[in-house]
């Protein structure tokens, strides 16, 4: 079992030379044998830089699907709703179980595409947004994203949480780049952008409230 702590981004080289970069608070289990290289993503997000081995496919299992690769670079993000696969280099096959005992459905991705799947369904592949691939550097970038989604991502990196009490404020759009593990700096960036004041609760979380 390989894991990263809250706020930690950790890179591990596997026995076959492949590299796995774990995002904050992520867990994988690695099981290699003579026929395949299996990695189970139990929690969080990981980037896989796969060493080529024609005899043993590299398989990442997560949630409702699995990703099969030979020599490539891709991200897998395990979410409550399912998984998101982002392909940076090479090619991968994304498989998901089919109902009624049918053969598993599969989709091939090309570099620059991503695919979201949930139990029994999948969206069509779409182009990735370059900022979404920067997380291994410790920076998070967003383009025209709902503020509530930005904070949900940022809050994974720190025990200090940033909270918005007004749902309407959470739907406002954010574009910017920030260091993932510095919540105070992020709150100080967002506050003036949206006319919000920063308060602290008893747990030292940061509350963004409507300004007076």
Name every feature range the model reports, one short phrase each.
Residues 1-77, 81-84, 141:
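Juxtamembrane extracytoplasmic segments of single-/few-pass membrane proteins
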Residues 4-9, 52-56, 87-89, 110-111, ...:
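A short, compositionally biased
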Residues 25, 114, 159:
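ATP/adenylate-binding site constellation spanning eukaryotic-like Ser/Thr protein kinases
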């Amino acid at each position: 079992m390989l894991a990263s702590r809250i706020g930690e981004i950790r890179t591990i080289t596997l026995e076959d030379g492949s590299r796995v970069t774990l995002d904050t608070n992520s867990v994988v289990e690695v099981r290699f044998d003579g026929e395949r290289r299996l990695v189970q993503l139990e929690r969080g997000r990981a980037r896989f830089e796969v060493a080529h081995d024609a005899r043993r496919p590299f398989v990442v299992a997560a949630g409702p699907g699995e990703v099969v690769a030979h020599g490539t670079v891709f991200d897998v993000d395990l979410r409550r709703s399912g998984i998101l696969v982002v392909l940076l280099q090479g090619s991968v096959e994304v498989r998901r179980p089919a109902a009624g005992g049918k053969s598993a459905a599969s989709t091939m991705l090309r570099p620059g595409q991503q695919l979201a799947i949930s139990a029994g369904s999948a969206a069509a592949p779409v182009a990735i947004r370059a900022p979404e691939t920067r997380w291994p550097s410790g920076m998070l970038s967003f383009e025209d994203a709902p503020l509530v989604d930005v904070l949900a991502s940022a809050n994974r990196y720190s025990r200090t949480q940033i909270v918005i009490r007004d749902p309407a404020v959470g739907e406002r759009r954010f574009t910017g780049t920030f260091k993932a593990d510095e919540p105070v700096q992020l709150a100080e960036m967002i506050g003036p952008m949206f006319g919000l004041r920063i308060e602290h609760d008893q747990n030292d979380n940061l509350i963004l409230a409507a300004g007076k």
